[in-house]
Amino acid sequence: MSDCPFCLIAEESNENELIAVNRSAVAFFDKYPVSQGHALVIPKRHEANFFNLLPEEQLDLWKLLNEVHLALSDTFLPEGFNVGINIAETGGQTVDHAHVHLIPRYGGDVEDPRGGVRWVIPDKAPYWGTK
């Protein structure tokens, strides 16, 4: 899809932009990172919904995610990670090409990191304070 920014990255295979590549996925640094080393892993084939990818494409994404995790760990020395997939507009997806966020986390990057990805719905996140 020529107007999809992620397809352009995957098609051009610009080695300067890519962190890693396998048979059906590529990884690159997020253009608008929320932390140092924030990366995206995407399928080469255009598909908006992660769950509509072929099983082998999903597997390749996860394999590449593991490879990128090791590279980011060696390069940036984060203390933790968040992994996230936004699906559809309601789920927060802003680019209609499936992608997995790999977000390195560092001590002190937020006041209280408990709950991690649960904060996508702030009112429900602090479950540890309920009885």
Language-model region placement:
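HIT superfamily nucleotide-processing domains
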Residues: M1-K131
